[in-house]
């Protein structure tokens, strides 16, 4: 059995080829590269396309579907629209359309939004959107890797999304625009709201630079800002303050969900969550009274492949989300 998982992230598209539960290869294409090259031609370097049994696909916000759905049944790529989602480059759209126009079987993974009925109704009442599809994939990877039925998953990268899993189902959480900051994205504070009202900046532009990049004022584009801030932690005061502030913000978000999970299992993921120098996970552990673990790199793509594999093995729901395939 050969499956492929797709993670549509802020900085690019990551794909995982898995055969009989074993990861065979992982590759990443920057969004700018996808605009010039075929994703399927790149994938063909790693696997015979005719041998793929199923692909698990993440795309954008995933707010147009509420089940894990056969790509043939999905309209408008599974989104309501592409507004208010951060910087749009177009690479993910090309990948999705290539996959849909091919004959490769695929399912589209939804995001977590108010129409996903498996979540606690209070979170649906509070927030229109909680997470994009790859966060479900990351959660499923964590669920399969560590075997916990109850845990908090915090994915820290360009943005931060923190989710709570209870009794093997996604219970709720906090979206990138609500709670903790990431490197690029974050919630809007008073100054940004005033700038939006004054028409100095759009809400989407504000969200896209409301992360700790606002501390360093060193925006280098979607792909390079992260490295610029993290690599200068020890020799630049603003970069140190930015990372320390991010750690505080994420720790606060995790702790706010801790009372809902007596098992106190916390799993960190994302490029910043697994960053080793500075060691972000150790910094967060100092603020958390719980069992803090770190998930493997490229966890979203691997999780998407795990979802595809288990669907082929007959699973009818993933973390409480129904499968329509």
From Swiss-Prot:
Instruction: Provide the protein name.
Output: UPF0285 protein MmarC5_0962
In terms of InterPro entries, this protein maps to: ATPase_NBD (IPR043129), Methan_mark_12 (IPR016735)
Q: Which family does it belong to?
A: Belongs to the UPF0285 family.
